[in-house]
């Protein structure tokens, strides 16, 4: 096997790959796409008629799933586009540690999943309002659950809820 051939797992999925190819014409509203190397959620799709050069074009409007920035792209409907693998997981917040030396750094979270596995490699979300709400609920003694979205090698907390609301 040559160096540039990928390692494939059962079912043909490439091990360690952050994206997979999909025909632009097969994209759906609410699905995902990579635009400029960023994972995005498709919010609008439109297909133009087949032109004199033979391909219908798909116009895509999407939001970056981590920043919320609006992004646009176009591709011939028969060409492949990159689609990110997106995983969502819910964790219980065990502890929030502030950086005492540098308060400008985001607080660090200790989390636990449903199987009891702990995770200590996530910071508070960059969205100050969301981070403040999580800290406020945790400091009030409530059981806080955070929703972590993972895509393109990035893990980020995008929302939270109280365990009682489950």
From Swiss-Prot:
Main location: cytoplasm
Residues carrying Hypusine: 52
Region of interest called Disordered, as start-end residue ranges on this chain: 99-125
Knockout consequences: RNAi-mediated knockdown at the bloodstream life cycle stage causes a growth arrest followed by death. Cells become abnormally round, the number of cells with 1N1K and 2N2K genetic content is decreased whereas the number of cells with more than 2N2K genetic content is increased. RNAi-mediated knockdown at the insect procyclic life cycle stage causes a growth arrest without cell death. Cells become abnormally round and about 40 percent have lost their flagella.
Any one GO cellular component localisation term in the record: cytoplasm
One of the record's GO molecular function terms: ribosome binding
Subcellular locations according to the entry: Cytoplasm
UniProt cross-references to Pfam families, sorted A to Z: eIF-5a, IF5A-like_N
Modifications the protein undergoes after translation, according to the UniProt entry: Lys-52 undergoes hypusination, a unique post-translational modification that consists in the addition of a butylamino group from spermidine to lysine side chain, leading to the formation of the unusual amino acid hypusine. eIF-5As are the only known proteins to undergo this modification, which is essential for their function. Hypusination is mediated by the consecutive action of deoxyhypusine synthase DHSc and deoxyhypusine hydroxylase DOHH.
Keywords: Cytoplasm, Elongation factor, Hypusine, Protein biosynthesis, RNA-binding
GO BP term (any one): positive regulation of cytokinesis
Alphabetized CDD domains for the sequence: S1_eIF5A (cd04468)
Statement: the UniProt record of this protein carries the keyword Cell membrane: no
Domain of life: Eukaryota
Claim: Coiled coil is one of the keywords in the record: no
Classification via InterPro entries: IF5A-like, IF5A-like_N, NA-bd_OB-fold, Rib_uL2_dom2, Trans_elong_IF5A_hypusine_site, Transl_elong_IF5A_C, Translation_prot_SH3-like_sf
Family: Belongs to the eIF-5A family.
PANTHER family, A to Z: TRANSLATION INITIATION FACTOR 5A FAMILY MEMBER (PTHR11673)
Job description of the protein: Translation factor that promotes translation elongation and termination, particularly upon ribosome stalling at specific amino acid sequence contexts. Binds between the exit (E) and peptidyl (P) site of the ribosome and promotes rescue of stalled ribosome: specifically required for efficient translation of polyproline-containing peptides as well as other motifs that stall the ribosome. Acts as a ribosome quality control (RQC) cofactor by joining the RQC complex to facilitate peptidyl transfer during CAT tailing step.
Descriptive protein name: Eukaryotic translation initiation factor 5A
